[in-house]
Amino acid sequence: MTDNIFLSVYYEDQNYHKFNAVSELSTALLIIDLQNTYTKLGKTADTIRFSQFSQRLEKIVIPNTKKLLFEFRKRNMQIIYCRIASHLKNGNDRSLSQKLEGWNSTLLFKDDYDSQIIDSIAPQSEEIVLTKTTDSALTGTNLRLLLNNLSIKTVVCAGIFTDQCVSSTVRSLSDESFDVIVPHDATAAGTMELHNAELTILNHIYCTVMSSDKIIDLLK
């Protein structure tokens, strides 16, 4: 899949390239909601509709996230994880959107296995892990303060779900005047249709969408 596919009507007639290089000193990798609970989707009778998501997570998203982690760690660049989990077992500290019935009714207690980061991409020593009860990582944590304290100007957002927590975080970061990059091959939504549609909406307005390999090539 090429980066050019994610062009909305607003930018389809423009040859728009924002990034010629990415600074190692002022760029952070933010990994959003890649947690154990989501590895079960598509593998049970009641979640079979997520089989496409499950395959993409296993074969594309996790391998490319590993690749990004390797390159960021090799360069001693900042890595931050964010996960969705409640501080209370009953989940009363969750935001309203996480308490409503249906898909968004997410109850993951912070100490439970399901809420932990997937083992194969688990954080290493001194890699920050934030816990949120919201879609946006900025709204639900002190991420904004951390990024400012760390002198971060550009944030690479990987993770799930493209059309939900990733999108909410990207928009919030953009509104706070951070440059945002989204690797299309290290993110996923419930379906490819949702994934592609959301990236097309976000691209060139709230972020720049590109491949993981392109991001690595731009690191300087």
Where are these regions (language model features)?
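A short alpha/beta connector and helix-capping loop motif
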Residues: 25, 41-72, 76-79
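Short acidic, Gly/Ser-rich segments with clustered Asp/Glu that frequently serve as metal-coordination loops
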Residues: 35-41
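Surface-exposed, active-site-proximal loop segments in enzymatic domains
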Residues: 44-50, 93-97, 173
